[in-house]
Every structure is written in structure tokens, then in C-alpha cells.
Amino acid sequence: MFDGALRDHPWPVAQWTVVLVAALVAALNDLHSRRIPNLLTLPLFATGVTQAYLAAGKAGLFDSLIGCAVAGLPYVLLFLFAGGGAGDAKLMGALGAWLGLAHSLALLLCVNVAGIVFGLLYARRHGRLREVLTSISGTIWTTTASVLGGGGISQALRQPPSPPLESPLKMPYGVAIFLGALLATGSLLL
């Protein structure tokens, strides 16, 4: 997928090792307490930015901050508008600070894929798969009909949302972040 980007470069291997260990700690904590603590995410962010600056100066610092924004911003938006966890957003931002722009894009893609698969398996395990799929298909149908019907995206945004689930199904997304980080690391090693 990424043409063996890590095989011959020791520094990215060290960065991905930090990312995997931090994501594993976050996943285990999320499974146990349904929280990803600031005690993990804030030092992770600070050390990510610091190592980038020490390794490459201002350019490294800029790359680290852009990586933080690319990996973290989608999860900040999910936190603000869709009930995602703040810890998930902070963890993704901190991981992005360690990885910089290029590898944050790989991480984001792989975490999203892992999140979809893990989310569907989690819903199935809790007997809610049909309900979740119905909600997702209703949202897709309403949005597609609004856009194709000439109303455009602004019309789609004004549509009433799909009927809510009986009660929100909260999954420990730290697990999906760890699985996505594993997937991204594996794809970079191939």
C-alpha cells in the first residue's frame, strides 16, 4: 500500500513503536474504564511535537502540528456534533503529532476502516446490528436523495436525521484506534 516506507528507515520505526504502544495503552484503558486519560494524551502530544522539532527544526514542528490537525480534527468534529469521545480526539491528535502529515493520513484511513469493521462487529455482539444498519442506510438515503434531488448539500444538511437508536451504542473506540494503527504499520512495512 505504501511501498515499504518503514523497512529501511529506523526513525519512523521508532515513531510507529511509540504510536502502537500508546494506542495499546489507550485501548486497554478504554476497554476497562471507557476513558482515554489526559495523563496519556497530553504528554504524548508534547513529546511528539518536541521530537519533531528536535529532529527537523521548524519544518518538523510544522509537520507535527499539521499531522495533529489531520488526525485529530475529524474526531474533534465527531465529539462536537455526533457524540464521539473527547479522549479519542485527543489521542488521534497526539498520534498525529508523532507521525506528521504523511503518516497521519495513513493512520486516519486505517483507523476509519478499523472503526467501521469494529463498530459493526460490536453492534452485532450487542444484538443491535440491524438497528445500526437501518439508521446508517436511512441517513445515506436521505442525504443522497437531497443532493440528487437538486437541493444540494445545504438541503441535505437541513433534512431531519434518521430516527435515533433506542439508546446510543457506545463502543470503546480506543480499540479501533489501536487496530487501525496496527493496520497502518503493517501496510507501511509491506
Where are these regions (language model features)?
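A membrane-topology feature that recognizes alpha-helical transmembrane segments
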Residues: 1-190
